[in-house]
């Protein structure tokens, strides 16, 4: 029979080893989390959601403003209505694609991070795994360039609505309010190329333009386009983070897969 003091000491030692083992396991698991990819995933989800949701509603509001004020003849803006409807369907596709792609990128980030940090023993990777990582690097670069174009394109309606809003502010200003020159301050939507030059009326002036700026459709569409543009910018930043993370992981995997590799990053 062992003394009670020795038995208690052994039990305390076993408990401390178990706690230490649990702590080391938690640290090991946390070390395998791709924090850069995780931040990029949250940012990408938020950006795509803002762009798709706000952009869809803003496009519908833009069509309503054009039909009610700038182009009363349906045949004049028929092509624009079809293009906007097509863009709304494209938005559905973008949201679905990025929902899947970002999840796959996050899973790939967990795989490559675990392999790079050798969390499961010695370094293990296959040629197929490195090929898949390289494919994700290429796709992410292509999507990053494409979203730069989307970000620039989403700034166009913001610029257009800002010009209309600033013109309305000029009409409301005390310097021009009540003068005969107010009715000569106009906005010609045809100059932006979204409706043909023969569209009627195409140009709105004075108090009629001020009434348009006071409508809920204009207010909501203007601010939703701003939020959609910000969402596109957030998506670009997320893809840039993905580019850096995937490129670094692929480079390390490629380097460590060499037989003559003797240096570790």
Swiss-Prot record:
Keywords, sorted A to Z: Cell membrane, Developmental protein, Differentiation, Glycoprotein, Membrane, Neurogenesis, Osteogenesis, Phosphoprotein, Protein transport, Transmembrane, Transmembrane helix, Transport
Stated role: May be involved in neural development. Involved in regulation of osteoblast function and bone formation. Involved in matrix vesicle release by osteoblasts; this function seems to involve maintenance of the actin cytoskeleton. May be involved in cellular trafficking of SERT and thereby in regulation of serotonin uptake.
Keyword Transmembrane helix on entry: yes
Cystine residue pairs: none
Top-rank lineage group of the source organism: Eukaryota
Entry-linked InterPro entries: Myelin_PLP, Myelin_PLP_CS
Residues that carry a glycan: 73, 177
GO biological process, any: regulation of focal adhesion assembly
Pfam families: Myelin_PLP
Entry-annotated residues carrying Phosphoserine: 257
Family: Belongs to the myelin proteolipid protein family.
Name of the molecule in the record: Neuronal membrane glycoprotein M6-b
Gene Ontology CC entries for this record: membrane raft; myelin sheath; plasma membrane
An MF annotation (GO) of this entry: structural constituent of myelin sheath
Residue stretches spanning the membrane: 31-51, 90-110, 136-156, 224-244
Topological relation to the membrane, as annotated: Multi-pass membrane protein
Self-association and partners: Interacts with SERT.
Compartments, as annotated in UniProt: Membrane; Cell membrane
